[in-house]
């Protein structure tokens, strides 16, 4: 039956894998009396599925992770409550004016910012893995929503803007929620820091440029502030003479905000024992400025409400804010509306992800806890799915409010509930006060909030010192945002960063290694280290890196060996080896036309020139795979092609192929599948590394001899080279002498186990592989000399 199966598989071109029994038998013959045999089992597809698919326990953990508050809520205590009360009240005082300001930025009425703020803090704590994050309206997302509304409002005049914004929140929330459910939060890691910094800086400059007209009161001068940032700046400067009394409110409030911040910061350093007091004073500066200028506005405009025959206010005010949740409703999901903003969805989703995950990870590291990015995506998704039922628009994590919450001493995510209560009070009790808030003051609040998101020059210089290319990506991203739009800037920076990543993988340069013997400064420890022959790693160029053996090459991969870089790697290997070695057998062509067109050999065969070539012939190649985490079908096929190419170069000799430092069983399986695990030398002596697992005596283990393995000598067996080296340890000799004097008729032996499988040319490190290759080559050389001597005697 087996013969028929083999014949059928042979017709299909499938080579039946080697039986496990055969491999184990060969392993036993290799191990001999030195060590117990060990043959590495290949991983199976079943094992892969078992590793990837969750078991019952993992599924239970997955379900529990969906509601992280269950892990800590039963331990909630009074001390935590006090910290959460302080932080929640502090953030609540800040989020009310910020929420209304960001709603203005989105082109919506102020109450929608309050709705978004309320839903964000109330919902988030159920799903939070960060105690510091505050979800709500943010400047960048509000700007993006404003751009979308400006584009869609003329097309759908019958649909209110807040319903379009709510529809956008539902769609983006559903996308992010699904990403969280399938646990792909790691995808955010593909967006590097320079791209995030460029996005934040460019967006901040765009927002500031768009708010300056409101700050100065010349927004109604007839120019559009939603175009490219550079055009907004130019138009603002042109209409600067048209500024009005709003500028007095806006500029002075902005100046006061920065003055209070600098004063509180200085006082905290000057009087460190009162640092906490100055922190809260600094945190509440926005609230103080809003209240102060609202009082001024009320004093000036209390009889200028623009209703009941009263004159218009002297400067622009928010106006009437409805009390309560007047816009609660089921979100309107219009297919035509969705079709019109679907092109903006990638940018909107990226904004939701970048700001929230970057902030949560940063504060997690600062406060010594770890967030779950995928669970944070679920939190964002649920918030934006529920929010539109209350009239909210897209929301995500806020940097400024998160920083305030962290510094205020928040203890748990429950602080969001405290903040939500304050927002609820504001929605129901303070709407009459909101009427007198100046729009110019709100513009000052926005400018002051987003100004901190601009990357400092010192940080840009740090980028330049670490990686000039990353610094250029940052600068380019900011310029693109200023001259086009936030969305295009996001796409370009992300795509450029991805292209740089792919280029670095595809054009990864390996290293040919040489040996240097080093020792510690006290001279007690000597070992071999392997450094690049060209010293590109920055090692001392005065050191002479030695080749391991004539015709033996050690090549280190610096990235995974995959389809993108396989040809680049192997081209480096082949080109270098052909330059460093000579062909074992020089082809002789009777006619010039017999020579291949791509063979640049001499026109005529010259034996003297061949004799003068002192380059060695190719003997062995050792690949250091310690940096390789993946191989694929393409890369393994390229490796087979290169093997055949170099085998022809060294023909009729055989080339040994060895692999060191393989860290993944699937890589070993792939190499074994293409027959790269064999030493390719029939005469090769089986060599493998072993490790001592302990010393035993015949009294403790009397079954060893019965099993036929026998005692292993107290001499150390160096299996790598087959050379017995005397163990010159005085302690062992003393113990043996004491045992003899005591008249014990027993012996002791050391037991060794192979580190890797004994039937494959895989080695733990480069040193082991080199020793195995050299031993085989020396063995071949001795046999050739003996054969030559025998031939000479016979003649």
Describe each PLM feature range.
Residues 1-62, 512-795:
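Cytosolic C-terminal regulatory domains/tails of membrane transporters and channels
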Residues 2-520, 524, 757, 778-779, ...:
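Transmembrane helical cores of multi-pass ion-transport proteins
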């Amino acid at each position: 039956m087996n013969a028929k199966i083999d014949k059928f598989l042979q017709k299909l071109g499938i080579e039946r894998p080697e039986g496990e029994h055969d491999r184990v038998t060969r392993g036993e013959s290799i191990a001999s009396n030195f060590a117990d045999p060990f043959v590495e089992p290949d991983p199976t597809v079943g094992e892969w599925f078992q590793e990837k698919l969750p078991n019952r326990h993992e599924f239970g953990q997955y379900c529990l992770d969906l509601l992280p508050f269950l892990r800590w809520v039963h331990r909630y205590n009074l001390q935590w409550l006090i910290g959460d009360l302080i932080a929640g009240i502090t953030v609540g005082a800040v989020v009310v004016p910020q929420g209304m300001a960001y709603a203005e930025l989105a082109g919506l009425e102020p109450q929608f910012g309050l709705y978004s703020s309320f839903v964000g803090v109330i919902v988030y704590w159920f799903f939070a893995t960060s105690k510091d994050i505050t979800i709500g309206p943010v400047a960048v997302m509000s700007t993006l929503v404003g751009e979308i509304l400006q584009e869609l409002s003329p097309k759908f005049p019958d649909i209110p803007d807040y319903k379009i914004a709510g529809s956008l929140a539902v769609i983006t929330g559903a996308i992010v929620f699904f990403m969280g459910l399938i646990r792909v939060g790691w995808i955010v890691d593909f967006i590097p820091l320079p791209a995030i910094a460029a996005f934040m800086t460019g967006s901040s400059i765009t927002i500031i440029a768009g708010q300056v007209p409101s700050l100065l009161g010349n927004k109604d001068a007839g120019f559009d502030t939603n175009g490219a940032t550079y055009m907004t700046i130019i138009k603002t400067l042109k209409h600067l003479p048209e500024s009005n009394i709003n500028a007095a409110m806006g500029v002075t409030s902005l100046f006061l905000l920065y003055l209070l911040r600098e004063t509180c910061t200085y006082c905290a350093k000057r009087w460190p024992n009162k640092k906490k007091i100055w922190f809260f004073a600094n945190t509440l500066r926005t609230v103080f400025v809003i209240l102060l200028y609202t009082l001024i506005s009320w004093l000036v405009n209390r009889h200028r409400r623009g209703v009941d025959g009263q004159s218009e206010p002297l400067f622009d005010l928010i106006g009437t804010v409805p009390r309560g949740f007047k816009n609660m409703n089921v979100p309107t999901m219009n297919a035509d509306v969705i079709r019109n903003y679907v092109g903006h969805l990638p940018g909107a989703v990226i904004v939701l992800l970048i700001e929230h995950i970057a902030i949560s990870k940063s504060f997690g590291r600062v406060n010594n806890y770890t967030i779950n990015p995928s669970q944070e995506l679920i939190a964002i998704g649920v918030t934006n799915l529920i929010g539109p039922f209350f009239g909210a628009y897209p929301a995500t994590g806020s940097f400024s409010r998160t920083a305030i919450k962290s510094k205020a001493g928040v203890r748990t995510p429950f602080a969001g509930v405290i903040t939500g209560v304050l927002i609820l009070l504001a929605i129901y009790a303070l709407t009459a006060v909101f009427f007198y808030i100046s729009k110019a003051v709100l513009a000052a609040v926005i400018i002051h909030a987003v100004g901190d998101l601009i990357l400092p020059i010192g940080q840009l210089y740090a980028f330049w010192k670490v990686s000039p290319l990353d610094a250029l990506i940052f600068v380019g991203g900011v310029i693109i945002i200023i001259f086009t739009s936030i969305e295009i800037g996001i796409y370009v920076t992300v795509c450029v960063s991805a292209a740089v990543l792919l280029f670095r993988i595809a054009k990864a340069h390996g290293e040919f290694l040489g040996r240097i013997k080093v020792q510690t400064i006290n001279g007690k420890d000597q070992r071999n280290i392997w450094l690049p022959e060209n010293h590109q790693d920055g090692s001392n160029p005065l050191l002479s890196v030695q080749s391991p053996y004539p015709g033996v090459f050690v090549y280190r991969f610096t990235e995974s060996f995959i389809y993108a870089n396989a040809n680049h790697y192997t081209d480096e290997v082949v080109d270098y080896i052909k330059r460093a070695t000579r062909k074992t057998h020089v082809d002789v062509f009777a006619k010039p036309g017999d020579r291949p067109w791509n063979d640049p050999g001499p026109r005529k065969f010259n034996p003297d020139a061949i004799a003068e070539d002192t380059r060695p012939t190719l003997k062995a190649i050792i690949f250091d795979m310690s940096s390789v985490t993946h191989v694929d079908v393409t890369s393994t096929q390229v490796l087979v092609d290169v093997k055949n190419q170099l085998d022809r170069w060294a023909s009729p000799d055989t080339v040994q192929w060895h692999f060191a430092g393989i860290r993944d069983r699937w890589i070993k399986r792939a190499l074994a599948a293409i027959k790269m695990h064999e030493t390719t030398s029939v005469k090769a002596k089986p060599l493998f590394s072993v490790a001592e697992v302990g010393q035993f005596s015949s009294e403790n283990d009397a079954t060893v001899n019965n099993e036929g393995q026998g005692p292993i000598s107290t001499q150390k067996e160096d299996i790598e080279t087959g050379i017995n080296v005397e163990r010159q340890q005085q302690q062992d000799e003393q113990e043996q002498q004491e045992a003899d004097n005591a008249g014990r008729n027993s012996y002791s032996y050391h037991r060794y186990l192979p580190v890797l499988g004994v039937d494959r040319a895989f080695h733990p490190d480069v040193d082991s592989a080199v020793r195995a290759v050299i031993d085989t080559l020396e063995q071949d050389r001795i046999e050739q000399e003996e054969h030559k001597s025998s031939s000479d005697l016979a003649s």
